[in-house]
From Swiss-Prot:
EC identifiers of the protein: 4.1.1.49
GO cellular component entries: cytosol
Gene: PCK1
Family in the record: Belongs to the phosphoenolpyruvate carboxykinase (ATP) family.
Record's keyword terms, sorted: ATP-binding, Decarboxylase, Gluconeogenesis, Lyase, Nucleotide-binding
Residues annotated as binding ATP: 243-250
Organism: Eremothecium gossypii (strain ATCC 10895 / CBS 109.51 / FGSC 9923 / NRRL Y-1056) (Yeast)
The protein's annotated pathway: Carbohydrate biosynthesis; gluconeogenesis
HAMAP family, A to Z: PEPCK_ATP (MF_00453)
Catalytic activity: oxaloacetate + ATP = phosphoenolpyruvate + ADP + CO2
Lineage of the organism: Eukaryota, Fungi, Dikarya, Ascomycota, Saccharomycotina
Biological process, per Gene Ontology: gluconeogenesis
Gene Ontology MF terms: ATP binding; phosphoenolpyruvate carboxykinase (ATP) activity
Protein name from the UniProt record: Phosphoenolpyruvate carboxykinase (ATP)
Length: 541
C-alpha cells in the first residue's frame, strides 16, 4: 500500500501516497486551533459560538452509520473477528477500490490536514495514529479527541501504527461489490488503515479507532478494552461506568469530588486503567450550566460544537433545539474539565463496576447489587431503552440490547470481553452495581417519573463511601436483583419498584414479565457460549 522509500517528512509521504507533485496543495500537520478555525470558517454553516467554540455542520449524516461499517476479510485477522451484522465483510478488492477512490478525492482538495497523535495514555500500550482529512473541523475534532503529542514526541513520531483516510465528503460507488449505500467506514487490519467515504460525521473517526483498540489490545496484549467512563476518588478508588447513549455515563463520571480519568473509552491492563482518548465527546441536547456545569463550561475556544442550532446574531447556542438532530455534540480536550486526572490513567484497579441503564419500562430498581454471574449476564445483555419521538410513528420506547454496552464497536465475540471482565473483577475483588437512570413508579408512557439526577448521585456517593455495601437488602422477584432497603438521600419508596408502582403490584408483575421475556429472547444468541450459572443469573420467568 505505502511506498517503501523513506521520506523526510509526513507531508512528503502523504504527497507520495496520493501521487501529488510538490506544492499542488497545502498540507497542514498538527495545525493549531487558530489556523483550523480560520480554514473552517470558509465552510458553510460554520461559525464561532458566543463562548468561543467552533460550530460545525456534519452534513447529511448527523450520527454514525453502523450498517455501513466494514472490516476487510484478510488472513491475518479473519479467524478472530466476530463476523455478522456488527462486522460485515469487505473483500480485499473492494478495499483497494474504496481506498483509491478516497485518494482520488483527497488529491483534488485545496487543503489537507494531518493529525499525528496517540490512542492510549499508557506508554506501554499506546498506538500512533495518523488522520488524513480535508475538513478543518475534522482535524480540530481529532486533535481534541486523540492524545496530543509534545513537540519532542511529534518530532520523533515516525511512522504511524494506524492511518485514517477521511474522504467523507465523497460517496462510495454503490456498484462496488459489497456496498449497500454511498457510505462506507472500512477497516483493514493487515494494512492498519481505515477509509471513510460518504459521511462527514466526525464520530466515525473516533469510533473506528475504538474498534481498532477493541481488536489490538486483547489480541496483542491481553488488555481489556471497554466502552466505559472512569473516575478516581480521593482514596484512589477507581469506578468504571458502563452505559449506552443517554444513560448518563458522561454526566455521572464528571463528579466534582472525583478525578475524571475519561468519559467513554478505556482499557484495563495488569497495571491498572487508562483512557484511550485525549478528549471528551459529550451530548449537548438539553445541556445547562446548572445540571452539568463541567461540560457546559468546557464549551469554549478550541472546542468543537457539532450540529447545534444557534442565534445568528448573538451566536448563543440553543441546547434545547433538536431541529438538526437529537445527537448534538461537543468535542473538547479533557484538560477543559477541571477535575480531569492528567495523565489520564490510574495504577489502581477498579473497586466498583457500575452498569447504567435507562429503563423506560420502569421495571428495574434505581440501584441493585450484582453477583459475579449477574455482572456477566447484564454486561453481555447491555440493556437500555431507545426513546420514542425521534422517528415518525414511534410512540413507545423500544428495548434495545448492545452487548458489552458497546456492540457496534466490538471486533471480537462478546464472550471474549465478558470473560476477561469477570476474570479481572475476581482478581481485584471489585463490586458491581446496576443503576437505572430511567423511569420509576411506572413506564415512560404510563405516568412514570424519571429518576432525578440528584438521587442517582446520592446512590453513587453511597457506593463510593462504602455504606451501600453494608446496607440491608431484599430480593426483586424474577430478575433476582438485590435491592437496598435504604440509601441516604434517596426516598425509600423509590428503591423497590414493585412497592412504588402507581398501578399496583399486580400491574408491575405484568411489566416485569414483559421485560424479562425480552432479556431472555436477546440472550439466546449468547447462550451456547455462556455457562449455566450465567444463564441462570438472568430473569427467571
Amino acid at each position: 500500500m505505502s511506498p517503501s522509500k523513506v521520506y523526510q517528512t509526513p507531508e512528503e509521504k502523504i504527497r507520495a501516497e496520493l501521487g501529488l507533485s510538490s506544492g499542488v496543495l497545502t498540507i497542514r500537520r498538527n495545525a493549531p486551533a487558530a489556523v483550523l478555525y480560520e480554514d473552517a470558517l470558509a465552510e458553510r454553516k460554520t461559525a464561532i459560538s458566543s463562548t468561543g467554540a467552533l460550530i460545525a455542520y456534519s452534513g447529511e449524516k448527523t450520527g454514525r452509520s453502523p450498517k455501513d461499517k466494514r472490516i476487510v476479510d484478510e488472513p491475518t485477522s479473519s479467524d478472530n473477528i466476530w463476523w455478522g451484522p456488527v462486522n460485515r465483510k469487505a473483500s480485499e478488492k473492494t478495499w483497494l477500490i474504496n481506498r483509491e477512490r478516497a485518494a482520488d478525492f483527497l488529491r483534488t482538495r485545496e487543503h489537507l490536514y494531518i493529525v499525528d497523535a496517540y490512542a492510549g495514555w499508557d506508554p506501554r500500550y499506546r498506538i500512533k495514529i495518523r488522520i488524513v482529512c480535508c475538513r478543518a473541523y475534522h482535524a480540530l475534532f481529532m486533535t481534541n479527541m486523540l492524545i496530543r503529542p509534545t513537540e519532542e514526541e511529534l518530532a520523533e513520531f515516525g511512522e504511524p501504527d494506524f492511518t485514517v483516510w477521511n474522504a467523507g465528503q465523497f460517496p462510495a460507488n454503490t456498484h462496488t461489490e459489497g456496498m449497500s449505500s454511498k457510505t462506507t467506514v472500512e477497516i483493514n487490519f493487515r494494512a492498519m488503515e481505515m477509509v471513510i467515504l460518504g459521511t462527514e460525521y466526525a464520530g466515525e473517526m473516533k469510533k473506528g479507532i475504538f474498534t481498532v483498540m477493541f481488536y489490538l489490545m486483547p489480541i496483542n496484549h491481553n488488555v481489556l478494552t471497554l466502552h466505559s467512563s472512569a473516575n478516581q476518588g480521593p482514596n484512589n478508588d477507581v469506578t468504571l461506568f458502563f452505559g449506552l447513549s443517554g444513560t448518563g455515563k458522561t454526566t455521572l463520571s464528571a463528579d466534582q469530588h472525583r478525578k475524571l480519568i475519561g468519559d467513554d473509552e478505556h482499557c484495563w491492563s495488569d497495571y491498572g486503567v487508562f483512557n484511550i482518548e485525549g478528549g471528551c465527546y459529550a451530548k449537548c441536547i438539553g445541556l445547562s450550566g446548572e445540571k452539568e456545569p463541567e461540560i457546559f463550561n468546557a464549551i469554549k475556544y478550541g472546542s468543537v460544537l457539532e450540529n447545534v442550532v444557534y442565534d445568528p446574531v448573538t451566536r448563543v447556542v440553543d441546547y434545547e433545539d433538536s431541529s438538526i438532530t437529537e445527537n448534538t455534540r461537543c468535542a473538547y480536550p479533557i484538560e477543559y474539565i477541571p477535575s480531569a486526572q492528567i495523565p489520564c490513567l490510574s495504577e489502581n484497579h477498579p473497586s466498583n463496576i457500575v452498569l447504567l441503564t435507562c429503563d423506560a419500562s420502569g421495571v428495574l430498581p434505581p440501584v441493585s447489587r450484582l453477583t459475579p454471574e449477574q455482572v456477566m449476564y447484564h454486561f453481555i445483555s447491555g440493556y437500555t431503552s431507545k426513546m420514542a419521538g425521534t422517528e415518525q410513528g414511534v410512540t413507545e420506547p423500544e428495548a434495545t440490547f448492545s452487548s458489552c454496552f458497546g456492540q457496534p464497536f466490538l471486533a471480537l465475540h462478546p464472550m471474549k470481553y465478558a470473560t476477561m471482565l469477570a476474570e479481572k473483577m475476581s482478581q481485584h475483588n471489585a463490586s458491581a452495581w446496576l443503576i437505572n437512570t430511567g423511569w420509576t413508579g411506572s413506564s415512560y408512557t404510563a405516568g412514570g417519573k424519571r429518576c432525578p439526577l440528584k438521587y442517582t448521585r446520592a446512590i453513587l456517593d453511597s457506593i463510593h463511601d462504602g455504606t451501600l455495601a453494608q446496607a440491608e437488602y431484599e430480593t426483586l422477584p424474577v430478575f433476582g436483583l438485590s435491592i437496598p432497603k435504604a440509601v441516604e438521600g434517596v426516598p425509600a419508596e423509590l428503591l423497590n419498584p414493585a412497592k412504588n408502582w402507581v398501578e399496583g403490584e399486580g400491574k408491575y408483575a405484568s411489566a416485569v414479565s414483559a421485560l424479562a421475556s425480552k432479556f431472555t429472547e436477546n440472550f439466546k444468541i449468547y447462550q451456547d457460549q455462556a455457562t449455566e450459572e450465567v444463564v441462570r443469573a438472568g430473569p427467571q420467568i
